[in-house]
A protein has these predicted regions:
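Basic nucleic-acid-binding interfaces
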Residues: 1-25, 33-73
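Positions that flank functional sites
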Residues: 30
Length: 73
């Protein structure tokens, strides 16, 4: 499936449904962390639109497939 265009805030909102929690913000980047092991940390830019390459990379780091991400609406 094709990746949707989402903002940084929308990305964080969707990942909260998978157990990620907002930790803090450093400049224009939001830091989120998985609440259970392996406590994966992600740095998400707070932009209006995330580039599809960056979005794919963040999903890979989070261990979430594109299809799974799309279903998290």
């Amino acid at each position: 499936m094709k990746l949707p265009v989402v903002s940084g805030k929308e990305f964080v909102k969707r990942l909260k449904k998978k157990g990620y929690d907002f930790v803090h913000q450093e400049g224009s980047h939001m830091i989120i962390r998985l609440q259970t092991e392996p406590y994966t940390k992600l740095s998400v830019p707070n932009h209006k639109e995330l580039d599809r390459g960056l979005l794919r990379s963040l999903l890979k780091d989070a261990g979430i497939s594109v299809d799974e991400f799309i279903k998290l609406k």
